[in-house]
Amino acid sequence: MSLDTAEKQKLIENHQVHPTDTGSVEVQVAMLSKRISKLSDHLQGNIHDFASRQGLLKMIGKRKRLLSYLKDKNVQKYQELVKKIGIRG
């Protein structure tokens, strides 16, 4: 499940570190989280879509690695991002 341009732009604006930022860890995690939630909704109704399930697991793994990296580099930003996105507790 991909995001349309307007959704991507809104996520980038909400999570960017500076005006031209499109690839920081915060932006990447926000985009992955949105894609994960859309794909999870899709899988609720399409239980036997195993290809999408595999893609979901890959996205979850990538988000986990990015969050781990951010936590190692800057715990304060990590905590703010987790709270803002609403994941992990």
Swiss-Prot record:
Keywords: Ribonucleoprotein, Ribosomal protein, RNA-binding, rRNA-binding. GO terms for molecular function: rRNA binding; structural constituent of ribosome. GO terms for cellular component: cytosolic small ribosomal subunit. One of its GO terms (biological process) is translation. Residues 1-23 are annotated as: Disordered. The keyword Ribosomal protein applies. PANTHER family: RIBOSOMAL PROTEIN S15, BACTERIAL AND ORGANELLAR, SMALL RIBOSOMAL SUBUNIT PROTEIN US15M. Belongs to the universal ribosomal protein uS15 family. One of the primary rRNA binding proteins, it binds directly to 16S rRNA where it helps nucleate assembly of the platform of the 30S subunit by binding and bridging several RNA helices of the 16S rRNA. Forms an intersubunit bridge (bridge B4) with the 23S rRNA of the 50S subunit in the ribosome. Part of the 30S ribosomal subunit. Forms a bridge to the 50S subunit in the 70S ribosome, contacting the 23S rRNA. This is Small ribosomal subunit protein uS15. It comes from Prochlorococcus marinus (strain AS9601).
